[in-house]
Amino acid sequence: MESIAKAKSLPNKGRTYDSQRPWNRDSPFSFAAWWSTPSTRYLKVDQPSGRDEHDSLDLEDEDVSNYLASHRERQKRRASCAAKAKVLIIGCAVISLFAIIGALGFALGRRATLPGSCASPAHQNPHTPPHPRPTKGEAHDAGHSGSHSSSSSTNNHHHSHDDSPPPPHVGIDKPKQCGESPDEAQSRGCIFEPQLTAWVAPECAFPAVVAEYQDAVGDMMTEWPWFWDTGLQKAVSPEEFPSLQAGNYSVVYTPYQASHALHCLYCWRKVSYALEHGVDWMDARCHQFYHQRHCAFFIADKLLEMEDWRAAAEVDVQGRLTTWTYPLLYHNCVPLSSTMES
């Protein structure tokens, strides 16, 4: 035991973990001990090793040998703990870095949907050309079976037509969800929408819009003049109206001039209904961007072509023209996916 006391009382020439520090490097909670290499836990490079002092001891003394062995074992355990701590801290740092990068990416992605981030013309990419405005009198796309005939176009349009075909539908070669016959469409649960003259898959058919539109503009299948031929010689008889109402026909024609504009307005109503109710699906016709642009400028052209704007003006009960007020307003942006009223 005297030898152990002698070993403990040796000068601290190379021992930097004992009373020379305000903290104890032998403690497992000492960061100084964690982040130093095993060789510096009891040695100092610029000083003689503390082990030199042990050379003067009687190494045959069993107590001194046991003390030194246990001391080295403690140093090995501390080195192992320090290595594990390094791995743990580095792993936490890497995970935190990836979490920060992910959060920044999510925030940048969400920024486009926030009210203050709507893309105004000033913020658009100057290298991206805007959608071209369809020319006046742009012909309705051939996919709409209720399009007006060429004779009615000539009588009501005072400008040239651009007969360039519309862009094809995306996925036009895919199988039709509603089949290719009225019976097949009914068997698949599809719904007939008169203003589209089409059977529509149930996911994007809105019976409520069909009903409200019919209340507003009437039953087009019974109130408009219909014909079986383009020459308007073979009229659809009243007895055949139920077949039109049920969507059980191939093709019909009408000279009713408001049909085109009413069809466009119906599509807009479907889009607004879908936004209002959070519906994720829209029929291919009303979803078509070309069709939306065409409808907007077609209706605008028809309004501007009116020879007497007073003929379409609203009057009050005293016969005075209604005056529309246009104050200067400042609108915010709202997410297009919002179902809340703005």
Swiss-Prot record:
Classification via InterPro entries: Phomopsin_biosynth_assoc (IPR053008)
Function: Part of the gene cluster that mediates the biosynthesis of the phomopsins, a group of hexapeptide mycotoxins which infects lupins and causes lupinosis disease in livestock. The role of phomB' within the phomopsins biosynthesis pathway has still to be determined. The pathway starts with the processing of the precursor phomA by several endopeptidases including kexin proteases as well as the cluster-specific S41 family peptidase phomP1 and the oligopeptidase phomG to produce 10 identical copies of the hexapeptide Tyr-Val-Ile-Pro-Ile-Asp.
Region spans: Disordered: 1-22, 118-186
Residues bearing glycans: N248
Organism whose genome encodes this protein: Diaporthe leptostromiformis (Lupinosis disease fungus)
Bias-annotated ranges (Low complexity): 144-155
Annotated Gene Ontology cellular component terms: membrane
Keywords of this entry: Glycoprotein, Membrane, Transmembrane, Transmembrane helix, Virulence
Keyword Hydrolase assigned: no
Gene that specifies this protein: PhomB'
Protein name (Swiss-Prot/TrEMBL): Phomopsin biosynthesis cluster protein B'
Compartment(s) of residence: Membrane
Primary subcellular site in the record, as a coarse category: membrane
Annotated membrane topology: Single-pass membrane protein
TM helices/strands, residue ranges: 87-107
Domain of life: Eukaryota
